Structures are given as C-alpha cells and as structure tokens.
Design a protein with these regions (language model features):
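Conserved catalytic core of the tyrosine transesterase superfamily
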Residues: 1-299
Length: 299
C-alpha cells in the first residue's frame, strides 16, 4: 500500500477536523497519535494493496493488538473512535466506498466514580486564598468559575474578558459550532470585577483584555500552573486526597443532577457529545458516600 498517500489523507483529515469542525488542539493531537498507531500496524500487512482493501478483520486485529499491549478499555474506546471518524471522513469524501469500521462497536467499560468536593472542602479552598493580591483575586475567581460553571480547565484558560455578560451572569465558551453558553455565580461575578481592576492596575500597558487569566509576566496562565496552584491550595487547606480542575466540573455535574436539573440541559451545559457521559452523574449520586458530600452542598 502507498503509505505516503495514506499519511496524506490523515493530514488532510486532521486539518479538516481542526479548522472546519473546530476540534481542540489536544483532541487533534490525540487523534493523530491514534492514527499513527493504526498506520504502523497496517504497515505490517504484507498483502494490503491499497486503502480500499482495509477490512473489518484488519481493524479488529489492530484492536486486538492494543488489548494485548494492555491498553485500558477507556483508551481502547477512544482509539477506536479516532479510527471510526477517520474512515467516515474517507467515505464521505469518496476515497473509499465501504467503511471497514461500520460494524465494529466500542468495548463496554465501567465508568470510574469521579471525585466530588464537599462544600466544606470548597470553603477551605476559598479561605486559604489571599485576595489582597492580584494573583489571589485571580485564583479565587478560578475556583468560583470552575465550581459554578462546570467548564473544563482548557476552556477556563482560553477565556478572554469579552465573553462575559455580567448582567446575565453568563459567558460563551468554545468556538463556532462548538460554542455554548454557561452560567456562573454571583461570587464569580464579584471576583471577576475585582480581579480585572487589579489586573489593569498591576500590568498597566501590558494589560490585555483578550487573556483573562495571566501569570506574573502578563502572559496566559498554563495548564501546568493551574494544576500547581490547585495542588498548593489543597495542601494549605489540608485536603489530603488528590484533586484537580476536573474535580470542580464533576462536583458541578453531580450537584446539578442532585437538585433536579434535566439531564439533557446538563449535557448542553457541560458540552458533552454523548448523553451516556452525562448519565454517570445520575449513577454516582446513588452512592451513599457521594450523597453525604452532596448533602453538605445544600447546607
């Protein structure tokens, strides 16, 4: 098979996914790695003449090899998803007539119970942040936004000031067809105003309204820095278990479901593609240990 041509199709597909479907950069990187693994596997098929000869048996063989390499079911499911959307793209563009992945289903797996923060833990995090400094106001706003909006860390860090509607307490995350409106708390609104004023005063001519969360150099806060500051505040708050930016998103999801929010509305707020992903919050609130934590949120 002409693998140079195959790799050309992959590049065209990745370009299409990033700039037409507006998938995130991290998603593109993951898909690229998955398709590179597929290319490597197919290169060992001696009798493969061209791309139209790729069969369901070959795709199943690829998945079997991944299983033998002890790839987890969740990762295996994601890799199959990457392969499926690639071949759908090829079929849509009439490069192939038959999609070899059409009859192949993703493996079922048990959804892990995500970490849910209690109101006590969130209050402890608030209490250890020094809001007398610009960086402290920034960090307090980060905590309030993550907790009350349910956005991802990537969405948080990409925010500019113009996407905020303070009067309606809503903001727009994402771009193009993948954009959505989410809402935030009154606390987040107040810390947004205080932080922006402090940022203007601190950075003066280096102040940039297109980047909300900045470091001491007035450049965009990185994902690594975000994780470090959450780790630092968790340690100061004497929270012994590991938490991450996603802990706030999971807390938001479970909290909304426990208060009767329609699951399809929650799906839209969280930006989930598949309703099954959102349904995990229905499952976790059934667990007694989680219910105990959620009860604290109501106090």
């Amino acid at each position: 098979m002409d693998f140079a041509l195959f790799e050309k199709y992959i590049k065209e597909f990745l370009f299409y996914s990033e700039f037409t479907e507006e998938k995130s950069r991290n998603t593109i990187i993951s898909i690229k790695k998955d398709l590179e693994q597929l290319t490597e596997y197919l290169s060992e098929e001696k009798d493969l003449e061209d791309i139209t000869k790729i069969s369901p048996i070959m795709i199943r063989g690829f998945l079997l090899k991944l299983q033998k390499d002890n790839i987890g079911k969740r990762s295996l499911s994601r890799k199959l998803s990457s392969v499926k959307i690639f071949f759908r793209y090829l079929k849509k563009n009439e490069i192939i007539k038959t999609d070899p992945t059409h009859t192949i289903s993703a493996p079922s797996f048990q959804i892990e119970t995500p970490d849910i923060l209690s109101l006590d833990e969130i209050q402890k995090l608030r209490d250890v942040i020094n809001t007398g400094k610009c960086s402290g106001l920034r960090d307090r706003l980060i905590i309030e936004l993550l907790f009350s909006s349910g956005i991802t860390s990537q969405e948080l860090l990409s925010l500019g000031e113009s996407v905020f509607n303070l009067e309606e307490r809503e903001l727009i995350v994402g771009k193009g067809r993948n954009s959505r409106v989410v809402f935030f708390s009154e606390r987040a609104k107040e810390y947004f105003k205080r932080y922006v004023e402090a940022k203007k005063e601190k950075f003066k001519e280096r102040y940039n309204p297109d980047i909300l969360f900045v470091n001491n150099s007035a450049t965009r806060l990185s994902d690594r820095s975000l994780r470090r500051l959450i780790d630092r505040y968790a340690l100061a708050a004497e929270i012994t278990r590991e938490i991450s930016p996603y802990s706030f998103r999971h807390t938001f999801g479970a909290y909304m479901i426990s208060h009767g929010m329609d699951i399809f509305f929650l799906k839209e707020l969280l930006g989930h593609i598949n309703i099954e992903t959102t349904k995990m919050y229905q499952e976790i609130i059934k667990k007694p240990t989680i219910l105990k934590s959620l009860k604290m949120l109501e106090e």
